[in-house]
Amino acid sequence: HEATALVGFSQGGIMSLAASLQEANLCGRVMGFGSRFVELPVQAPETVTYHLFHGKSDNVIHYGFAVSAAERLVAIDADVTADVLPYIGHEIHPNMIDLAIERLTTHMPKRFYKQVQEADPGDSPVRH
């Protein structure tokens, strides 16, 4: 599941976001384009990273939903990136695709940082 990303645009993104909250270990990442949570989550799986992409000129699903979702995810200590792109409407724009590829290839999930912080230094394979 860790290598699986659910990707959705608009209603498909809404379904992907909802599925990640309903099914444990379904995926490691959710990429929502021009989408939103049906209801803002009260908790989120530690194993999921949320990547939200939204056009600021979206007249179907307002970009404020992405901002509110990101704020809530941060508040509940979930792993999230959020990108609101100016002059882009309700579409999967090439700039969003570029950002999605960048997020998939460069973003280190928060859970990995936590694992490193919680690791016992005596367990290190490096010997001095």
What do these predicted ranges mean?
Residues 1-2, 112:
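Short helix-terminating capping/connector loops at secondary-structure junctions
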Residues 2, 45-50, 76-79:
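Short, proline-enriched alpha-helix->beta-strand connector loops that line the catalytic pocket
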Residues 3-47:
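Primarily recognizes the serine-hydrolase "nucleophile elbow" in alpha/beta-hydrolase
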Residues 15, 58, 94:
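Alpha-helical and His/Cys-centered functional microenvironments
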Residues 33, 55, 85:
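Active-site-proximal beta-strand/loop segments in catalytic clefts of secreted hydrolases
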Residues 37-42, 60, 92-93:
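A short beta-to-alpha transition loop/helix N-cap that caps and shapes the active-site region
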Residues 51-54, 58:
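Short beta-strand/loop motif that positions the catalytic acidic residue
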Residues 64-128:
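C-terminal catalytic histidine-bearing segment of alpha/beta-hydrolase fold enzymes
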